[in-house]
Amino acid sequence: LEDPENRAHYLRFEKKPGFDAAALGVYTLENGHIRRITGAANGISEYLCVYDCQNSSTVDILDPRITDAFLALTHEKYFERFGAEFGKGIAGFFTDEPQYFRYETAYTPVLLTEYKKAYRADVLDLLGALFVDCEEAPGFRFRYWRLMNVLYTENFMGRVYRWCLSHSCRLTGHTVEESELYTQMWCCAGVMPFYEYESIPGVDWLGRKIGTELAPRQVSSAAQQLGKKQVLTETFACAGWDVTPKELKRIAEWQYVNGVNLMCQHLYPYSIRGQRKRDYPAFYSEHNPWTDELKTFDDYFTELGYLLANSREQADVLIVHPIHSAYLMFDRANDEASVRSVGEPFNVLIERFGAAGIGHHYGDERLMEKYGSVKDGKLTIGQCTSS
């Protein structure tokens, strides 16, 4: 992060009365169509300016050069010192919440070359369509966010996963904000392709709430389709110091019903001195007075998880995941409202399936493109077939 070349990028949009040569791209809107302009012109009273900005809080994980530098500074150092234990005492790595810059409209300079490779067009020609409604907006937004998802999965997660496999260890962990369409757009433009690059696909479940089945069913669907036996949840964070084992059992069983079979309890601190005690409690360590009584709890979920991991869910119903529909309309400034016409009906559908106890999987279109086929009127994704 000390090197500005490594920092995350995002886009800022402004309407200005004059042309700004400092902008990444400047546009005008004419009869519902957006057009890129390269200088001041007569008859234009409003210039739509898009700026390339950076944030020093995180790195640009969409850039493979930066991912390789990260691996060299972390994983390679571990291997130099502890390589003999890789695949033995050191089983693997856990990655926590990798994301592009989530607080604005995400961007990476890598798009300047990758967009041309993918679409034979200049990404700057229509970049303003991310911010204004125009005839070109749906098509451009789809292409933009689909490529952002590809860069996220291939240039970060795929590279880390391949490094782990080549060094005899496994990779697990989770992405971030998995439980809504619009929050997935904040961070990665779709979580399901991420799970292809985990030895044990994982999800994060915070607090005491029981939501829709989307988050655990996304990860379990991908795991079943890709033949990955175990599905991890990092769970119980933000449940509070006054949470009871009975409540924890309810939270965990709901996730296990929806496809999870391995638990990572958040968290086990060395100390809770000072502010540490407020780090998303409760903690499942000797600092919690009833932790010693959790053996029965842990044994139950260990045995249940073993049974589920060595079984296969019979889910004949496949729901095509609508994240690609969200690409067409997502506008970071309008956030949830911009994809509400897709998100709300999807949530209603999920709730109805859950209430009726209908087992189902989600089909991500990128995974379907790679692993899907149709035979005898049945759709197959990897190892799962739907009638």
Regions found by a protein language model. Give the residues of each.
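Carbohydrate-binding surfaces of carbohydrate-active enzymes
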Residues: L1, Y10-R12, E80-G92, Q99-S387
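Mature N-terminal, pre-catalytic/accessory segment of carbohydrate-active enzymes
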Residues: L1-D96
